[in-house]
Amino acid sequence: MKRRTLLKAMSSLGVIPALSYPALSRGIVDGGHEGPLLLQIHAEGGWDVTSYCDPKVNQPGERPITTWSETLDPVRVGGVEFAPFANNEWFVEKYHQQMLVINGVDLQTNSHTTGILHNWSGRNAAGYPALTALFAAHYAPTAPMAYVNFGGFGSTENLISYTKLQGDPAGIAEIVEPNLQGRVIDNPVYEDGHPVYFRQPAELSLIEAHRQARLQRLQARGQLAPREAANLQAFSEATRARGPLKDFADYLPKAEAIFPQDEITHNNLKAQVQVASSAFAAGVACAADVQMGGFDTHDDHDALHKPLVQLLNESIDLIWTLAETAGYADRLTVVVGSDFSRTPEYNSQQGKDHWPIGSVMVMQKAPSWGSRVVGLTDERQNAIAIDPVSLQADPSSGAIIYPKDVHEQLRQLLGLADSPLAARFPFNSGSGFRFFGDLS
């Protein structure tokens, strides 16, 4: 979809304010990625799943686990149950058919560092890549920005390089098109303004020709040291990516369309989503990590958690709105998770501390496995062993869900299970879980 059409649709949906739209529109960049896409959202700090996708109500004789359950019951829509907290009811009603909730995931730690590592690599020791890195290396190893990371866990284990970004489309545009000095409104053909360059395109073409000739001479020299040869090859690949990246600048939202930092939570998650969506729409990226902080609520838990959950849900809604509008929703998988969860009771500061049993949410457009919850926890949020095939409680001979089990199933879902790259990082859990049903 062309950028002009995309922005008009966004405005009509109320996603962004009304804008002036550039006439210089184009489709996906030449040779852009048109295959599967993966976006992961990290709720940094440890989210409280008892007020989200694994709702818990207070039990007689026990300390309160949630304050909302003093007057309300969990909200069930289809096969999914959420807490009636923040804007959860709106969110689950709109998206339950697109989601699978995996509860009772044992992160085996109360450490932020280990929890992040475990949740996003599938292992609680260093040495395994982020799922997004593996995905990008498998599906789009030569894309200019195949793997985009806005923070959080981003280990690549040398499978691929990542592009580190912030949620600042204006700044990114300056980087990907550094020769653009500005625009002058002097021609009705250019609604965005006539481009003014530091150097004219003809001059840059001449400089580029000389650069390529010199690079070829260097690469043709005999007896290059391995590091020197690798550096020259990396430079050659980087220069080839400049053309698509220049085109990518046309997909980025204009300054007045960029979501500002959230005033309550001080997160710019929506702006991160806008940049990631632009990269997906342009075909220059196939995997992205976005993150929001603030979930480490050791005091005043409910008051601090509520706006965070609301922003998270709104941002997921924005992801799917942009994906539908740009026409790539049927290629997108979204995974949402956190370091771990929070304790099944409040502390003396009305906060909640760290708890290892958490959840993961997976979303696609119209999946066969949607509107379901797998994994079990008891009334005090302890993990319950389940039968890997029936997914029913089996305390005597069942298995607890660990991040490695989630990653094994995600690899199956995403077509990575038989990848030679994935074979370098096996889990071999032997648990045989089938969260998504028969994927053969």
What residues fall within each predicted segment?
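Ligand-binding pockets and gating/stacking loops
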Residues: 2-440
